[in-house]
């Protein structure tokens, strides 16, 4: 079992425990009741543990990126779908994939901004395929940030999974 799977399991366990505690609080009179005060410290501990585990999951999922995996090259507001084509101890090399926008997507515009504002940009969906001629990026692991980064200042973040996005409003 990958470490990320073990972390996901632990997060689900905490969520279920929290749901049970909240159910107990409702049965015992709701928030402000002696039961809620009794459980408050435990709920706080669970929140902090879950937050810590979510961070660890983020780091592990990024660390587990391997050759052949899909990833996303996040620019400031646009994102490019890519594939990992090489991995070393401290770097991954990724290549831009061919992303084809669904013909069903039709941008909806309203007046505003410089000329108009696209109100449904989040509805974009794409199909992906490898592009052996796609642009290549070398990305370095950032221990501090827990992810691979690129760009001269490290401002470009690499995410897990393929996600193309075009910001029509920028």
Q: How does the language model describe each region?
A:
Residues 1-80, 91-170:
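Mixed-charge, low-complexity intrinsically disordered regions
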